[in-house]
Amino acid sequence: MTKFRGCIDIHSGQVKQIVGGTLTQDDTTELNHKSTTTENFVSTKPSSYYAELYKNAGINGCHVIKLGSNPENDEAAKLACQSWPNNLQVGGGINGDNALEWLDVHKASHVILTSWLFSDSDEGKEFDWVKLKRVSELVGKSRLIVDLSCRELRVDDKIEWVVAMNKWQTLTNNKLSAEFLGEVSQYCDEFLIHAADVEGLCNGIDVNLVAKLGEWCPEGFEGKIVYAGGARSVKDLDTVSKLSDDKVDLTYGSALDVFGGKLVKFDDLVSWNELH
């Protein structure tokens, strides 16, 4: 059954909502005050506030994403996990060296891996199956989420979704498909998929991608694919439910009132989950 999932995006140590396509620089201390990233919302509240908000509302499976290598992002993510230990999924800069620390020390429920899973090849960035298998064995399949966020590519009137890494700026050689998702699913517990072209714009979800994710959903992964990007109405949950045959979950960002948005009320999403 489709459900609402929560997110906590962290940039420069603060909870923010940004336009995904503008995240072209690493978030370092030096760039804090001259970033080119377009911000929709910058919270005055700590990450722990949002962790407790989701906890008290019973919104499970929420993710915390560190947008850049700024050490302040690590501290904010740790604070969120301390507020709801063993319940939040953490991504952004996670690799084979620090994954266990986030799980066992900082008490994330899952780690979300993206860019580290890709290696250089003669043709560009290629999904590294050796790395995937290694980290899956290290942390356990049940604690690993693979982020396969993507950008839309049109070739001869055919729509394809190419997996994007490096803050969604670098296109890889891998495209989303039933076969690809099926193979990756053998080593992880969930997928997180941002539609990078519509992320943060509040102009509507990528309905074609949502439908395909429902079609391509591996057996046993119903309710384990989280789509993010463009949600602007509570009715988007109904749309995702219908298009994906209840196999895909939906997260909201810039449209949500708790992130300064004016289109969607958090309480309405909580009620939707309770009713369904």
Curated annotation (Swiss-Prot):
It comes from the Eukaryota. InterPro entries: Aldolase_TIM, His6-like_euk, His_biosynth, Isoase_HisA-like, RibuloseP-bd_barrel. It is an enzyme of class 5 (isomerase). GO terms for molecular function: 1-(5-phosphoribosyl)-5-[(5-phosphoribosylamino)methylideneamino]imidazole-4-carboxamide isomerase activity. It catalyses: 1-(5-phospho-beta-D-ribosyl)-5-[(5-phospho-beta-D-ribosylamino)methylideneamino]imidazole-4-carboxamide = 5-[(5-phospho-1-deoxy-D-ribulos-1-ylimino)methylamino]-1-(5-phospho-beta-D-ribosyl)imidazole-4-carboxamide. One of its GO terms (cellular component) is cytoplasm. Its EC number is 5.3.1.16. Pathway: Amino-acid biosynthesis; L-histidine biosynthesis; L-histidine from 5-phospho-alpha-D-ribose 1-diphosphate: step 4/9. It holds the Pfam family His_biosynth. Disulfide bonds: none annotated. Keywords: Amino-acid biosynthesis, Cytoplasm, Histidine biosynthesis, Isomerase. It is found in: Cytoplasm. GO terms for biological process: L-histidine biosynthetic process; L-tryptophan biosynthetic process. Its main location: cytoplasm. Belongs to the HisA/HisF family. This is 1-(5-phosphoribosyl)-5-[(5-phosphoribosylamino)methylideneamino] imidazole-4-carboxamide isomerase. It comes from Debaryomyces hansenii (strain ATCC 36239 / CBS 767 / BCRC 21394 / JCM 1990 / NBRC 0083 / IGC 2968). The lineage of its organism: Eukaryota, Fungi, Dikarya, Ascomycota, Saccharomycotina.
